[in-house]
From Swiss-Prot:
Coiled coil: none annotated. LRR repeats lie at residues 126-147, 151-172, 173-194. Residues 370-414 form the FBD domain. Pfam families: F-box, FBD. The keyword Transport does not apply. It comes from the Eukaryota. Residues 26-73 form the F-box domain. This is F-box/FBD/LRR-repeat protein At3g14710. SUPFAM superfamilies: F-box domain, RNI-like. The keyword Repeat applies. The lineage of its organism: Eukaryota, Viridiplantae, Streptophyta, Embryophyta, Tracheophyta. Keywords: Leucine-rich repeat, Repeat.
Length: 442
């Protein structure tokens, strides 16, 4: 806060003390109304409106605020209309020709037409940031409002929504897009493809979204850096395979985060310059073609459920860092990816094994007898085991790497609980193929 503004806020709380007394000078009176409006815009809208009771001169100053923030999460009562009445009054009385942001978070149900009315009004004022979080509302169609999104820099819709798009969607100013539980329909009678043209978009997030009647979704965003997709799917795909293809045209893309459990619904395609990916995969059999989309990465994080299955792992010829979260009783899973990463230098693993699972002596023996992949023998320099527990299973994996990694430099064992000195001494005494390998306990 600016020093002058901070001093102006130091008004005594006693009702008996006058605003302009010998000890306290009214600094606000000397501020321009535009400055006061900026200050009020930083407050929650309810607090900004409450300043209207200070004096006659303050009665309408709040109507010039440019940031609207409404939140009823502390009062769950669908029968109480005071919140919607308040929003209706503020949106109707606001006098600012330009509104920077509109934030609405509600845990109650109300008439969806009210939300549509509020958005229609604020979008006409060159709105830049729009955030709507209303999980209890029925499905809302934003389709007719979509052309009004052209001024938006940030759009976050966390509500059951419908977006009907019949032509290439162009949002020229959008930098951040986050959709949750959206139904996206391709309404074009000419093309089976859906083109999203966001020339300055930097971050794309989609979770629990569904795409209908679309063969290919093309996201044309040359400045896109972060792409996240969480449990999205497709329906009524107009091709025999019933697979919706998603092509991301983004030469500056830095990281992909993907979580899914329907391997045959979506196929992803990215530029070959993609450096980093995080994939959480579960259920059923994932086609080799899905993983092939990520073979260009140098850094890969994989979360694999116990029921994850893939017939063959493609070659990750540029992979240097692998973080694998998996059920360590399935040692073949680790071997699948080690054999497919010829230049791997850093391996980080974390166990997803159920506490009730106990590895058999046979499975531990199988791990020791597996031929070491080339990357372990000649390339691996760092091993990290996260959430390390000195049980038979994790010790067997640790010893496998120590026995075979000839140029290993560091072993990092990150444990949530203290490891006894006796256990540390036992681990430090394990034979090592690399004379330079050191073990660090975290």
């Amino acid at each position: 806060m600016h020093p002058e503004t901070e001093q102006a806020c130091l008004v005594p709380s006693s009702k008996k003390t006058k605003l302009c007394s010998e000890n306290f000078e009214d600094k606000f009176s000397s501020l321009l109304e535009s400055v006061v409006s900026i200050i009020l815009s930083q407050l929650p809208t309810a607090e900004a409106v409450s300043t209207s009771v200070l004096s006659k001169s303050w009665k309408n100053i709040w109507t010039n605020i440019t940031d609207l923030h409404f939140d009823d999460t502390k009062q769950r009562d669908p029968s109480d209309s005071r919140f919607t009445d308040f929003v209706e009054r503020v949106v109707g009385d606001i006098g600012s020709p330009h509104i920077s942001s509109f934030y609405l978070c509600s845990v109650n149900t109300f008439d969806e037409t009210l939300l549509f009315s509020w958005l229609s009004k604020v979008l006409k004022r060159n709105l830049q940031r729009l955030v709507v979080t209303c999980n209890d509302l029925e499905i809302i169609s934003f389709s007719s409002l979509f052309p009004s999104f052209v001024s938006l820099v940030e759009l976050r819709l966390r509500t059951k929504s419908i977006l009907d798009i019949s032509a290439p969607a162009i949002l020229p100013n959008l930098k951040f897009l986050s959709l949750e539980d959206a139904r996206i329909f391709n309404m074009s009678s000419v093309s089976k493809n859906l083109v999203l043209n966001f020339p300055v978009l930097e971050t794309f997030e989609a979770s629990y979204c569904r795409c209908f009647r679309t063969d290919t979704v093309i996201i044309d965003s040359p400045l896109l850096r972060i792409f996240e997709m969480f449990k999205c799917t497709s329906e009524h795909v107009p091709n025999p395979s019933q697979v919706c293809k998603i092509r991301v045209l983004a030469s500056k893309l830095e990281k992909i985060t993907f979580c899914g459990d329907e391997p045959r619904k979506i196929h992803l395609s990215f530029p070959p310059s993609l450096p980093d990916a995080y994939l959480a995969l579960s259920r059923s059999e994932w086609p080799k073609t899905f993983l092939r989309s990520f073979t260009c990465v140098t850094s890969l994080a994989l979360v694999l459920s116990k029921d994850f299955h893939v017939m063959a792992v493609p070659k990750f010829s540029q992979l240097v860092y692998l973080h694998l979260i998996y059920d360590m009783t399935q040692h073949f899973r680790l071997m699948q990816f080690l054999k497919s990463a010829p230049i791997l230098e850093m391996l980080s693993i974390r166990d997803l094994t159920s506490p009730r699972s106990t590895p058999t002596a046979k499975s531990l023996k199988e791990l020791r007898s597996v031929e070491s992949p080339d990357c372990v023998t000649t390339m691996l320099k760092v091993l990290q085991i996260r959430n390390f527990k000195p049980n038979r299973l994790q010790i067997s994996v640790l010893r496998y790497v120590l026995d075979n990694a000839e140029i290993l430099g560091s072993v990092i064992l990150s444990s949530p609980n203290p490891i006894t000195e006796e256990e540390k001494a036992r681990i430090l005494a394990f034979p090592k193929a690399s004379p330079h390998a050191s073990v660090l306990f975290e």
